[in-house]
Amino acid sequence: MRVEGRFVDASNATLFAHCAVGEEEVAVIYKPIAGERPLWDFPDGNLANRELATYLLSESLGLHLVPFTIVREGPFGLGMVQEWIEIDEELDIVELAQGPSERVRDMALFDAIINNTDRKFGHILPTSSGEIYGCDHGVTFHEAPKLRTVLWQFASLEFSDREIAILERARMVAPGLLAGLITPAELLALVARIDDLLLQGRFPEPSEDWPAVPWPPF
């Protein structure tokens, strides 16, 4: 791995690098665990494992919302390494994120499942080929309700049959898939959260007990 720069506005050490894959070089984001800033409300484990957990769950559910992610050794120790996504700079990210597209709706559902507390506009990555990915999933899976997102346009809408099937699969695969990446208490909370989503049958609404939108939203 060859580190080429650092994103100075990131709250944790976030490095731009290239990794050799066969005879090719792939651009990646590298976040060493040693560079993670301690968080009072996420005291256990590390953010890198949570990022890996979101990737594994997204792939298992067939959503493909998270770029390829692994945890591996790098120049500054063990850390998360994620494929770099070239975004389409011509797109209006606010207009896209506030729209009704199925891809954005999938992201809103996924955030409700993983209890994402940091879905900002800047954490949504649209490409010129029409794909939409999400990044920065380190603050997810908390056992307490902490959903904060800019994707509230689907609040209270009923789940489709496809979305119910996604939730049912998430409930089935998550405990085995994510064991060791998040805490046992967080795994139990994840299953309970999915059960509640299935019981309600609709997208959650903003909580009165927790800020609904991350700040700043970009």
Regions found by a protein language model. Give the residues of each.
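Conserved ATP-binding subdomain of kinase catalytic cores across diverse folds
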Residues: M1-T117, F121-G122, S128-C135
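C-terminal catalytic region of ATP-dependent kinase domains
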Residues: R6, A20, P43, T127-F218
